[in-house]
Amino acid sequence: MSSIVVVGTQWGDEGKGKITDFLAEQADVIARFSGGNNAGHTIQFGGETYKLHLVPSGIFYKDKLAVIGNGVVVDPVALLKELDGLNERGISTDNLRISNRAQVILPYHLAQDEYEERRRGDNKIGTTKKGIGPAYVDKAQRIGIRMADLLEKETFERRLKENIEYKNACFKGMFNETCPTFDEIFDEYYAAGQRLKDYVTDTAKILDDANVADEKVLFEGAQGVMLDIDHGTYPFVTSSNPVAGNVTVGTGVGPTSVSKVIGVCKSYTSRVGDGPFPTELFDEDGHHIREVGREYGTTTGRPRRVGWFDSVVLRHSRRVSGITDLSINSIDVLTGLDTVKICTAYELDGEKITEYPANLDQLRRCKPIFEELPGWTEDITGCRSLDELPENARNYLERISELCGVHISIFSVGPDREQTNLLEQLW
């Protein structure tokens, strides 16, 4: 099996969906391995724009399988809404497969997410309140309900009653709140499970069959390395592992199955939610990037925080995710700026450091050390090769590659498919 993993190298929203869709043309199977409907990606297909949250990008290709792996947490009601929306626009979803081992998000997870953020007050993490974290907590506590359980009426009824009793005790003690009732959950979610039943299967077997048949598998990451619960800006992170290594756990394939890891980044940096962001901009350059780049969350609609490109972040991501190739998006957004900056290192308490600190208090004290390069004013949205880029834009990309220690295989100068440029064959 030839396989490629696509991961975000920053704090999510790097354009992974677009790159996944671009690479999916040559794949046989496209599989998601982590996260839930807190992730949002925008796809241009057939001249139309689609915003997906749970459904893999491969859904648009009838001859390819789109797989939701066991590492994904699934809100069945939200998933059905997404599938219905695609069907209404003429997109078939018959090629979707959902792992029978995927955890189910239920209304008490959504309630718990809301209560937890309220309890934290000024120390809130800034979650999307989609129930992702609480669902992963239940998984670790071994009380989670999986897709296989949801489909069996007696099993779902028994497990749901047990969990509601437990959640009520927790909610009363911690939040002085009550859990959604059995009657408020059971009928709706059991019916949702029955509607999804034909999609649910052992997806690890599908991927193993693809391996045996020497098919091409594309693993689609969610969020980004800096939101990884182990390797990101903890605790301002997601509740799963977006790093490439989680492909093995989140889909059931072996580690030897991965051929390449494509790290996707923007030509600048963005972040949604709270947490440290060393290169964040609050000036006119930041306003330019946010408005030209349309930096508003796909899932939340919240304005994203934006900043200069941070090579300290990228080097960290390269190391912990084994990135072999770089895909740089949104280069066109920087057009018109007099100068562009790259963070090459941090200053921490008067000393220069080149590695990303694990300690949050240290990270907050870090000051970015910038290298300044001349900008460009030429319209680059029609460029199809590095040689066609203005010299200053080309020098900017080459400097990023040099600082991060990864060669560039893809660059993008706009949102459309034809504005994504492949510099070398990846499959």
Curated annotation (Swiss-Prot):
Gene that specifies this protein: purA
Cofactor annotation remark: Binds 1 Mg(2+) ion per subunit.
Residues the entry annotates as binding IMP: 13-16, 38-41, 128, 142, 223, 238, 302
Any GO CC annotation of this UniProt entry: cytoplasm
Cofactor: Mg(2+)
Reaction it catalyzes: IMP + L-aspartate + GTP = N(6)-(1,2-dicarboxyethyl)-AMP + GDP + phosphate + 2 H(+)
This protein's UniProt keywords: Cytoplasm, GTP-binding, Ligase, Magnesium, Metal-binding, Nucleotide-binding, Purine biosynthesis
Family: Belongs to the adenylosuccinate synthetase family.
Name this protein carries in UniProt: Adenylosuccinate synthetase
Phylogenetic lineage: Bacteria, Bacillati, Bacillota, Bacilli, Bacillales
Annotated metabolic or biological route of this protein: Purine metabolism; AMP biosynthesis via de novo pathway; AMP from IMP: step 1/2
